[in-house]
Amino acid sequence: MKKQRIVIKIGSSSLTNSKGSIDEEKINDHVRAIAALKKEGHEVIFISSGAVAAGFLQLGYPARPVTLKGKQAAAAVGQSLLMQTYIEHFADHDIKPAQILLTRNDFAKRERYRNAYATVMELIERGLVPIINENDSVSVEELTFGDNDMLSALVSGLIHADKLIILTDINGLYDSNPAEHPDARRFDYIPEITDELLGCAASAGSKVGTGGMKSKLLAAKTALSLGVNVFIGAGEGDDKLIQILKGNGDGTYIGQSDLSSVNNHRQWIAFHSPVSGKITVDEGAELAITENGGSLLPAGVTAISGDFPKGAVVEVYGPNGLAGKGQTLYSAAELEEVKGKRSDEFHHEEGIEVIHRNDWVSIKE
């Protein structure tokens, strides 16, 4: 089997018992499966939920807290308990785990985004298993990933993974809720995530987690757009992850074999960078940047909104609506001076492009 880079996301419901506390046997089962993958030569990045679930009972909460301060306090207690458990179980297989806690700002800030990539890659190259979780104890509610499903998709893109495996307590995607409809049919394979599928998916999470099936499909859609195929399902035993890679997993495979990876600069522009302004372009410019692989030139710019600096990321709108996002080579004030100007009106030593094609990402609304 070809050696692959695999991101594995395991949710709280697959790590805890009926009371919501850490289930040592479940964790041991997952660790053995990851160890089996490592033994085959695969690189593994582990997105683990469970910090809040591991900590809330320790704080005396009868159930998972719903307030931000309650969740953050539980995460502060639970994250260390969770990591200690992983360290002990991975030690049985001579594997060293490494903890990385991320916030949305770590992706939004360009330099921190690069640092996150460099750190994960260094750990992988040295044979460790990075265990990544959102830094729940300090995350601002408005600036979170939403749940670890989306975090796993963004991480899989960041490190150019070959596959994202999302393990859950449901063995794949069904055409209706199998708990309520015994005749529900499972999809063994779907090529893409459609709006119809998203509309059918239940959105509620479990009592010990935040991510329902809809969040997993949204994560899968994001991963596919970043060039990463996805598996959503369940599994038991030491070889469950190996069986998933072989195509024998108990769940749903999502995506096509010819997906193209997206470089990190474009990922940052598309999914993480703050938007500082808006540029409106004419039909010819819209066609050039969305269909013909061209750069945006001043001649096609018709309007500018926002006081953005050079190097900022802006949205670009054409006659058909949002065309995409790009990193501008002009400030708003500079662009006002040259908008509508033809290329032959520039001196040869001047830079012409408003947004270079390498700094552009098309977006379909």
Curated annotation (Swiss-Prot):
Catalytic activity reported: L-glutamate + ATP = L-glutamyl 5-phosphate + ADP
Residues that coordinate or bind substrate: S49, D136, N148
Gene Ontology biological process terms in this record: L-proline biosynthetic process
GO CC annotation: cytosol
Record key words, sorted: Amino-acid biosynthesis, ATP-binding, Cytoplasm, Kinase, Nucleotide-binding, Proline biosynthesis, Transferase
UniProt keyword annotation of Aminoacyl-tRNA synthetase present: no
PROSITE patterns: GLUTAMATE_5_KINASE (PS00902), PUA (PS50890)
E.C. number(s) listed in UniProt: 2.7.2.11
Chain's role: Catalyzes the transfer of a phosphate group to glutamate to form L-glutamate 5-phosphate.
UniProt similarity note: Belongs to the glutamate 5-kinase family.
Protein name in UniProt: Glutamate 5-kinase 1
Gene name per UniProt: proB1
